[in-house]
């Protein structure tokens, strides 16, 4: 995309500074205690009360208004069509790079949405569960392409979303273990008539144009609202290295960890390994497959160097 094309695309968004966005919060304090915020934090990022009040409270209110609009439209159409069609879940998609903090954003939105009027049932699903199992990736020579579009069972993900939006009472999703770096064969996430479903993953806004047999429908077609969590690559790389070092001292120490072989790396070796993985896999995926999708989002959250959201862009 040229600079002119990018500028034109960004004109489709209303831009808010953090201060401007924070003003949309009409004096409401976050309904989360300090302990609850701590439980929602990632392993290397904190969630301040100011971050919740300034950024996520207005976002939560916006999402609630969008959901209420959908409900009213559904009821109006039922009256017009003289049908009693079942109400289906409000689906929110959250995309962004590895290590950008999208999982924390997803958990925060889940916590706030569950406190909306009526206490809706809110489920969070990650697309990691729709990665092909390691044995399949190894057979296809794709282990070093894990996270790239071809490493996902997109058909299964689309089937899951189709069932969800068809109002199927019970929908199941596979689960993924970041410890074993593989699908958990003995665990399934079961969603029973949820009101809101958050689908989080690096690939949720991607448009797969490769392969004649791929369906002409995309994951994002099922979203009622989509969010892209953005940041400068140098900052994301810094966070990735920090996360790698923390995991080296914690999860990697466990014998069952896929990355157990990295447990004894020195600080210098850990940094070098994290940088190598980034520049050969995650950084390449970000540049080619993830970042180009941000302009497909309804809202972009742009973070600064300290995980603090500095700018919000909302599609007009």
From Swiss-Prot:
Keywords (A to Z) from UniProt: ATP-binding, Coenzyme A biosynthesis, Cytoplasm, Kinase, Nucleotide-binding, Transferase
Catalytic activity line of the entry: (R)-pantothenate + ATP = (R)-4'-phosphopantothenate + ADP + H(+)
Chain positions recorded as ATP binding sites: 96-103
Biochemical pathway: Cofactor biosynthesis; coenzyme A biosynthesis; CoA from (R)-pantothenate: step 1/5
Record bears the keyword ATP-binding: yes
Signal peptide: none
Highest taxon, organism lineage: Bacteria
Cellular component GO terms held in the UniProt record: cytoplasm
Membrane-crossing residue ranges in chain numbering: none
GO molecular function annotation: ATP binding; pantothenate kinase activity
Record Pfam families: PRK
Record-linked InterPro entries: P-loop_NTPase, PanK, PRK/URK
The keyword ATP-binding is annotated on this UniProt entry: yes
Family: Belongs to the prokaryotic pantothenate kinase family.
Name of the molecule in the record: Pantothenate kinase
Species of the source: Shouchella clausii (strain KSM-K16) (Alkalihalobacillus clausii)
């Amino acid at each position: 995309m040229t600079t002119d094309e990018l500028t034109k695309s960004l004109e489709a968004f209303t831009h808010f500074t953090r201060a401007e966005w924070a003003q949309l919060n009409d004096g409401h304090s976050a309904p989360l205690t300090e302990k609850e915020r701590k439980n929602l934090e990632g392993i290397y990022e904190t969630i301040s009360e100011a971050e919740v009040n300034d950024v996520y409270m207005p976002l939560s209110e916006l999402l609630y208004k969008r959901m209420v609009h959908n409900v009213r439209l559904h009821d109006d159409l039922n009256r017009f069509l003289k049908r009693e069609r079942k109400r289906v879940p409000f689906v929110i998609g959250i995309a962004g790079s590895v290590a950008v903090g999208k999982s924390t954003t997803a958990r925060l939105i889940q916590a706030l949405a569950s406190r909306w009027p009526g206490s809706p049932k809110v489920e969070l699903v990650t697309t990691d569960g729709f990665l092909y199992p390691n044995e399949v990736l190894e057979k296809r020579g794709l282990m070093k392409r894990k996270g790239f579009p071809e490493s996902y069972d997109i058909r299964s993900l689309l089937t899951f979303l189709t069932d969800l939006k068809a109002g199927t009472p019970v929908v199941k999703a596979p689960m993924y273990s970041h410890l074993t770096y593989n699908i958990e064969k003995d665990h399934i996430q079961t969603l029973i008539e949820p009101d809101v479903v958050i689908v989080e993953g690096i690939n949720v806004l991607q448009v797969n144009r490769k392969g004649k047999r791929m369906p002409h429908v995309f994951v994002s077609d099922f979203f009622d609202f989509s969010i892209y969590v953005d940041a400068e690559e140098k900052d994301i790389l810094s966070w990735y290295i920090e996360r790698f070092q923390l995991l080296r001292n914690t999860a990697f120490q466990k014998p069952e960890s896929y990355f157990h072989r990295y447990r004894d790396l020195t600080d210098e070796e850990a940094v070098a390994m994290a940088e190598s993985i980034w520049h050969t896999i995650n950084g390449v995926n970000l540049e080619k497959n993830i970042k180009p999708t941000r302009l497909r989002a309804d809202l972009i959250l742009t973070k600064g160097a300290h995980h603090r959201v500095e700018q919000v862009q909302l599609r007009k």
